[in-house]
Regions:
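N-terminal Rossmann-like or analogous alpha/beta NTP/dinucleotide-binding catalytic cores
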Residues: 2-7, 12-134, 283, 288
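Proline-centered helix-kink/hinge sites
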Residues: 12, 129, 145, 294-296
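Hydrophobic helix-cap positions at the C-terminus of alpha-helices
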Residues: 28-31, 164, 299
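Active-site cores that bind ATP or allylic diphosphates and position pyrophosphate for catalysis
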Residues: 111-282
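Glycine/threonine-rich helix-loop capping motifs at alpha-helix boundaries
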Residues: 162, 288-289
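Generic detector of well-ordered alpha-helical packing
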Residues: 44, 136, 150, 296-299
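Conserved small/polar residues in nucleotide/adenosyl-binding loops
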Residues: 291-300, 308
């Protein structure tokens, strides 16, 4: 029986952090056992913004190594670097020739990044979603794990495949390209910054204290959590829009400890930050130490909290 094919990837724009693991890679580890999986280090996407070539090369190697350290098994999944497969860029050019410009101009991420870069914004940044479409369509992916921030880009890939390629060059019974479906991961799909509970944890954030890198030493993890932004309200709770930091840190604890949000809410309802932060730090350190143990496959299968 043919297994459904899945493709996903992460940009090597810095060290992988908890958001990358909880939002993506942890789910990949489960998917590789039930799907035909392709996991890519998307270095061509990383050059759409200012970068240091030598650092990008080092980060590309580091990202690939961390894929394996996190439990991606080369015997179960295909792991590769995007730029090493010329067909990605070749298909992107073909798709460029049929994609309307106004489709790209309405992409939310482009609008946000263009404001930050001003006159330095590149054509590559505008064209980023077409390259992403090529990444997906090249491998006939059935499903693509995406967070909410990438959902619009996947919809563009679907539109390009169906409206601009299949309807013009194929037929109902013989489509040229497979139209992929989104796989939205609910749990851990969007891990927020330690310094701003309303902003996504990001490798590009200039404040190192905003994220926990997978290779941070225990003392640095503890320091970052101790300094994480909180509020003066006693008692911890989920779902209060006026307390985004509480929601984020409690959510991290739930994901890293393997407990449900209901269990964590009950456990921490009467806690103050002074008691909760050491608990979160200890749990986070234990999780991140998984990446330095000698046997990634055994480590992942026996100790990593399940994403189910």
């Amino acid at each position: 029986m043919t297994r459904p094919r899945v493709l996903s990837g992460v940009q090597p724009t810095g060290s992988l952090h908890l958001g990358n693991w909880l939002g993506a890679i942890r789910n990949w580890v489960d998917l590789q056992r039930s799907h035909d999986t392709f996991f890519c280090v998307v270095d061509l996407h990383a050059i759409t913004v200012p970068h240091d070539p030598k650092q990008l090369a080092a980060d590309t190697r580091s990202t690939a190594a961390l894929y394996l350290a996190c439990g991606i098994d080369p015997e179960q999944a295909t792991v590769f670097v995007q730029s090493q497969v010329p067909a990605h860029a070749e298909l992107a050019w073909l798709l460029n020739c049929v994609t309307p410009l106004n489709w790209l101009e309405r992409m939310i991420q482009f609008k946000e990044k263009a404001v930050k870069q001003g006159d330095n914004v590149s054509v590559g940044l505008l064209d980023y979603p077409v390259l992403m479409a090529a990444d997906i369509l090249l491998y006939d992916a059935d499903q693509v794990p995406v967070g909410e921030d990438q959902k619009q880009h996947l919809e563009l890939a679907r539109d390009i495949a169906q409206q601009r390629i299949n309807s013009r060059f194929g037929s109902d019974d013989k489509p040229v390209l497979k139209v992929p479906k989104p796989m939205i991961m609910k749990e851990g799909a969007r891990v927020m910054s330690l310094t701003d509970g309303s902003a996504k944890m990001s490798k590009s954030d200039p404040n190192e204290g905003a994220r926990i890198n997978l290779l941070d030493p225990p003392e640095l993890i503890t320091k970052k959590i101790k300094r994480a932004k909180t509020d003066p309200v006693m008692g911890l709770e989920f779902g209060n829009s006026e307390r985004p930091e509480a929601d984020n840190l409690l959510g991290l604890y739930a994901l890293l400890s393997g407990q449900s949000r209901e269990q964590v809410a009950s456990e921490c309802a009467e806690m103050g930050w002074g008691r909760f932060k050491p608990l979160l730090a200890e749990t986070t350190v234990e999780a991140c130490l998984l990446y330095t143990s000698p046997s990634p496959r055994d480590r992942t299968r026996s100790r990593m909290p399940s994403s189910a």
